[in-house]
UniProtKB/Swiss-Prot annotation:
Database matches in InterPro entries: HAT, HAT_Syf1-like_N, HAT_Syf1_CNRKL1_C, Syf1-like, TPR-like_helical_dom_sf
Protein name as it appears in the record: Pre-mRNA-splicing factor clf1
PANTHER family: CROOKED NECK-LIKE PROTEIN 1, PRE-MRNA SPLICING FACTOR
A GO CC annotation given for this chain: Prp19 complex
HAT repeat residue intervals: 52-84, 86-118, 120-152, 154-185, 187-218, 220-255, 257-291, 301-333, 335-369, 379-415, 417-448, 450-482, 484-518, 520-551, 569-607
Keyword Ribonucleoprotein: no
Primary localization: nucleus
Complex and partners: Associated with the spliceosome.
Length: 673
């Protein structure tokens, strides 16, 4: 019972010695198939028996066509049977009856015509074909049958007449090609040429013009080929141009080694066809230039290809200024001034839609590059000046301006040795839309011209317009210092540090201190540090103050040129500054600043101090400890804090004092009891 359950198991899984393929199985199945039944051959003993059989078959066929008149297969089987019986008149009658039912049945016409041709009834077949093409003039199969029969019979004029009747209906391209092939077979090239002329009028597709040109190339002259291509270009116009036509034309000229003609054809086509319709043309032109052109020709091909590419990108977005930059550089490389101007003029016409400066930043460089090209490359000074002028007119200066354009216009006038125009330009800029960059550019110009009085005037106007600009005060003072007018420089610094709205006052203070240091006015410098410390307790100020004190020479050292070691007085002054700073930070509990100060103090002692001084400062260095503090949401967080030994000692002394006071109070109370 257990062994009978489940699928049978294969004990021997090795392959059989004889393998049977699917092909072998199919072959055996076909070989063993039983033969189909065949109808017995009928034999008629006499004519009466034949007539009886024919009558019976005709009755069957008549019943078939009567029951289903529109089924042409019944009619055609009936007519075919009559043809087998050599009853041609009856067969014609059946075909005519069928045509009365459906005169548009092409298979019926074909069967009728072929039966007449098979029995060599040529005139009957010709009449049938004439009737058929008259009733169904758009059925090419009937026309092909007609011309084939006439040509087979050697009736070439009749064949031409049939073709002419057919061509009057303006059939498909295949019919015209068949007519042309007929004339070519009989060497009637003039007739074929005339047919091509009519053919290209009815079907003016470029491929048909190419067929005509190849015909002329084979049987005509090169002038006729050029005439065909020229007529094709003129007929098609720019709307229906095709790259294949120009490629074929150029290759024909290349065969004749007319390389300049071929190049002109390629360029003509590339200038007129859009990029999407001339990809293959570009490849063909590139290949042509590589084979037959020079280096300049190959570069022109690449330029033309990129030119079309940029045009396609600009069709998608005319305000893509990056594409305009690339396009302009491309034309500048080509060396055609008119093309360069055309691209720049088209580019600057794409004004940003909004009056927001971020939209104008890229656009304004088109004007700048245009003006520079006119000046440097085209050498057209008047046109460059006009470009700058038009650009400045276009910018909405009441909302924003571009100092770069004003400055470049002024520098352009300087290069033309027209200083008055340059000053007028910058003066107009400062009057319309003052900016720090404009002032700096104007001042740099006057400084290069050694017009220091004008520089002073400009600095005064800049400070009057924007007194919060620290750099303006510093540069003004440096100008006066460069002119050896230290009193004016010092007065400017004094005015600068007194300004309450400075954007970066620390720069002015530092410049003032460095100025006094360079002048050797150490007492003034010390006073400046003291005044600065009244305004701020920044740790860097204290550290720089201490470094200043260590570097200040004594009166005897000032007179000597040789360097001497740092005096004890200088070290004492520096330590005094460090100690003052340490007290300030300790009182204000500024731990981070205190640590930074102690690090600088320790570095100072390691460099200039004694071992006792170093040990003293090391004892003051803090240690980092981890502490916890409570947050607003009753949670705790850990943080790193600094613990200073001096603070611990003070706390310990205070704790000891309190403990002694408490003990004394207890003793006093016990004695009274």
């Amino acid at each position: 019972m257990e062994a009978s359950r489940g699928p049978p198991r294969v004990k021997n899984k090795a392959p059989a010695p004889v393998q049977i393929s699917a092909e072998q199985l199919l072959r055996e199945a076909v070989d063993r198939q039983e033969p189909s039944l065949q109808a017995p051959t009928q034999r008629f003993a006499d004519l009466e028996e034949l007539h009886e059989y024919q009558g019976r078959k005709r009755k069957e066929f008549e019943d078939y066509v009567r029951r289903n008149r529109i089924n042409m297969n019944n009619w055609m089987r009936y007519a075919a049977w009559e043809l087998e019986q050599k009853e041609f008149r009856r067969a014609r009658s059946i075909f005519e009856r069928a045509l009365d039912v459906d005169s548009t049945s092409v298979p019926l016409w074909i069967r009728y015509i072929e039966s007449e041709m098979r029995n060599r009834n040529i005139n009957h077949a010709r009449n049938l074909l004439d009737r058929a093409v008259t009733i169904l003039p758009r059925v090419d199969k009937l026309w092909y049958k007609y011309v084939y029969m006439e040509e087979t019979l050697g009736n070439i004029p009749g064949t031409r007449q049939v073709f002419e009747r057919w061509m009057s209906w303006e059939p498909d391209e295949g019919a015209w090609s068949a007519y042309i092939k007929l004339e070519k077979r009989y060497n009637e090239f003039e007739r074929a040429r005339a047919i091509f002329q009519r053919f290209t009028i009815v079907h003016p597709e470029p491929r048909n013009w190419i067929k005509w040109a190849r015909f002329e190339e084979e049987y005509g002259t090169s002038d006729l080929v050029r005439e065909v291509y020229g007529l094709a270009v003129e007929t098609l116009g720019e709307d229906f141009m095709d790259e294949k036509l120009f490629i074929a034309y150029a290759r024909f000229e290349t065969k004749l080694k007319e390389y300049e003609r071929a190049r002109a054809i390629y360029k003509y086509a590339l200038d007129r066809l859009p990029r999407s319709k001339s990809i293959t043309l570009h490849k063909a032109y590139t290949t042509f230039e590589k084979q037959f052109g020079d280096r300049e020709g190959v570069e022109n091909v690449i330029l033309a290809k990129r030119r079309v590419q940029y045009e396609e990108q600009l069709k998608e977005n005319l305000r893509n200024y990056d594409v305009w930059f690339d396009f302009a550089r491309l034309e500048e490389q080509s060396g055609d001034p008119e093309r360069v101007r055309d691209v720049y003029e088209r580019a600057i016409a794409q004004i940003p839609p909004s009056q927001e400066k971020r939209h104008w930043r890229r656009y304004i460089y088109l004007w700048i590059f245009y003006a520079l090209w006119e000046e440097m490359e085209a050498k057209d000074i008047d046109r460059a000046r006009q470009v700058y002028t038009e650009c400045l007119k276009l910018i909405p200066h009441k909302k924003f301006t571009f100092a770069k354009v004003w400055l470049m216009k002024a520098q352009f006038e300087v290069r033309q040795l027209n200083l008055q125009a340059a000053r007028k330009t910058l003066g107009q800029a400062i009057g319309m839309c003052p900016k720090d960059k404009l002032f700096r550019g104007y001042i740099d110009l006057e400084r290069q011209l050694f017009e220091f009085v004008r520089c002073r005037t400009l600095y005064e106007k800049q400070i009057e317009w924007n007194p919060s600009n620290s750099q303006s005060w510093i540069q003004y003072a440096e100008l006066e210092r460069g002119l050896d007018d230290t009193e004016r420089a010092r007065a400017i610094y004094e005015l600068g540090i007194d300004q309450p709205t400075l954007d970066m006052p620390e720069l002015v203070w530092k410049a003032y201190i460095d100025f006094e240091d360079d002048e050797g006015e150490y007492e003034r410098e010390r006073q400046l540090y003291e005044r600065l410390l009244q305004k701020t307790d920044h740790v860097k100020v204290w550290i720089n103050y201490a470094r200043f004190e260590i570097n200040v020479p004594d009166e005897e050292e000032e007179e000597e040129e040789e360097e001497r070691p740092i005096s004890d007085e200088a070290k004492r002054r520096a330590r005094a500054v460090f100690e003052r700073a340490h007290r300030v930070f300790k009182e204000k509990e500024l731990k981070e600043e205190r640590v930074e100060l102690l690090n600088a103090w320790r570095a100072f002692e390691h460099t200039h101090g004694s071992p006792e001084d170093i040990d003293k400062i090391e004892k003051q260095m803090p240690r980092r400890v981890k502490k916890r503090r409570k947050l607003d949401d009753d949670r705790y967080e850990e943080y790193m804090d600094y613990v200073f030994p001096a603070d611990d000692q003070s706390a310990a002394n205070l704790s000891k004092l309190l403990r002694m006071a408490h003990q004394w109070k207890q003793e006093t109370a016990g004695g009274q009891q």
